[in-house]
Amino acid sequence: TKAQLARWVDYANQKGAVIIYDAAYEAYISQEDVPHSIYECEGARTCAIELRSFSKNAGFTGLRLGYTVVPKDLKVNDVSLHSLWARRHGTKYNGAPYIVQRAGEAVYSAKGEAQLKQQIAYYMKNAACILQGLRDAGYRVSGGVNAPYIWLETPKGMGSWQFFDELLENAGVAGTPGAGFGPNGEGYFRLTAFGSYE
């Protein structure tokens, strides 16, 4: 929620820490109390960098188009991170290919925005269906509300890779074993709503 995120912003400002905030799924947010940007929180411009991607909202996975917001107010030890980022980026990065830039431009056209809203609504309908189906089948689940991913606890203490094999072999369903996200992901499994409703 915005209140929870605001507490992190306050903490970062008190400790002199920098938050790197991944807003890749911003377009999927539907709940009013969940911010679309960390900069909706007072004080975030002095402690946060926000990452934005076209991969999740516009299906640009593999094309690598996104942007980073580094506020001019963000300083560490009195050094502007905005200036350092601009210098680094201007020296090391030559920009996205022209055709990818044009595709990114199309995302912000009236037609592009309408198509993306329609596509996101479709994926979220899928997420709601998967979420309810898993609940009805007795699984402990979460997610599928402000992002197109549904997490479930693997049954009977089964390892996430073992559950992956079982689902693939017996149901023809592929997903992502939680162990792939690190040791705390073990015992969980992630399904995606990026598919056809049927």
Residue spans for each PLM region:
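PLP-dependent class I/II
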Residues: 1-198
